[in-house]
Design a protein with these regions (language model features):
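N-terminal signal-anchor transmembrane helix
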Residues: 1-12
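Short active-site neighborhood of thiol/selenol oxidoreductases, capturing the structured segment around
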Residues: 11-41, 56-57
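Sec/Tat-exported extracytoplasmic proteins
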Residues: 20, 45-49, 78, 99-102, ...
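Structural microenvironment flanking redox-active thiols in thiol-disulfide oxidoreductases
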Residues: 38-98
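Thiol-/selenol-based redox modules, centered on thioredoxin-like
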Residues: 111-165
């Protein structure tokens, strides 16, 4: 992948090679699940900020509206640490393709719906080798819900992966 972050810097998969990272999909004007997800990603950023093995990656699903300037303002408002967390924008079809094919974050639908909006509450944990290790409900820090992993479990899994290396 190759996208542009909140600072206008090109971000590629090379920037995440050998890193544990958490990916999600959002847009800055979302009024439903995104504000809570972003707050929870800020919570996660605070927990992992001293771990050099871990990064965060948020993809805008409305890249035409979420320009570099918009992402920069949003990042500043939310307290994003630039070295830890990239908010990226780019070609919408590329973002939706990576969401579906690389992160598997949406249910498969009809081919004509391929580029409909990707809107999911999932945080995706990717290990140092680029393998998906789990999907976690980005709206749930610590509630126990059947068949669902919460963000406390995500943090435990990040710590486990950090110790393995």
């Amino acid at each position: 992948f190759a996208f542009t972050n909140q600072n206008g810097k090109k971000v590629t998969n090379k920037d995440y090679e050998g890193k544990i990272y958490v990916a999600d999909f959002f847009f800055t004007t979302c009024q439903t699940i995104c504000p809570k997800m972003t707050d929870n990603m800020v919570w996660l950023q605070d927990k992992i900020k001293d771990n050099p093995k871990v990064k965060l990656l948020s993809h805008s699903v409305f890249p035409d509206e979420d320009t570099v300037e918009v992402l920069k303002k949003y990042a500043k408002e939310k307290g994003v640490i630039d070295e830890k967390w990239n908010l990226v924008t780019g070609n919408q079809n590329d973002i939706y393709k990576i969401a579906r094919q690389s992160y598997l974050v949406v249910k498969t639908g009809k081919p004509e719906e391929m580029y409909d909006m990707v809107h999911t509450e999932n945080f995706v944990l990717v290990d140092q080798k680029g393998r998906i290790r789990g999907f976690y409900n980005g709206l749930n820090i610590d509630k126990n819900v059947k068949d669902e992993k919460n963000l406390t479990q995500l943090l435990e899994d990040i710590e486990f992966l950090s110790e393995k290396d």
